[in-house]
Amino acid sequence: MSRLIKMIVKCYHSVRLLLCMEGYKRAEYIRKHNLFGSMGENCYFHPWKMPGDPELIFIHDNVKIASDVTFINHDISNALLNTKYKTNKFKYFTASTEIFDNVLIGTGTIILPGKKIGPNCVVGGGNSSLQGCA
């Protein structure tokens, strides 16, 4: 699929998610249309914005994600370093995020690249995710 078509499809799904006012319906829409790497059962997804690399997000069962949670699955510091040092040796970094069963993620949390949030965790609002269980 061409890059332009992918962008159009992503915009379409973003608008459709905005129309799903309720978090359980959003999670169901994400699961039904395979927008993430995976979306488990009985999930709640309230963020308004779609992650940049949604295929790198894996959410297990009974996960509740509050509003204004941001998923970051890439790091573009390579652009800065390659320009500064006039090289191409610094590579673009992406990593998947996995959220295991029975997790609550509070409002305003930032989930950083490559993080795994273990089962039965509560991540308080406004935090940057740490590996494991907070």
Name each model-derived stretch.
Residues 1-42, 77-78, 120:
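Terminal amphipathic alpha-helical/low-complexity segments used for targeting or macromolecular assembly
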Residues 26, 45-117, 132-133:
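Flexible, glycine/small-residue-enriched loop-and-beta-strand segment within the central core
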Residues 20, 34-37, 103-105, 111, ...:
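Generic detector of intrinsically disordered, low-complexity, polar/charged segments
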Residues 7-10, 115-130:
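C-terminal/domain-terminus segments
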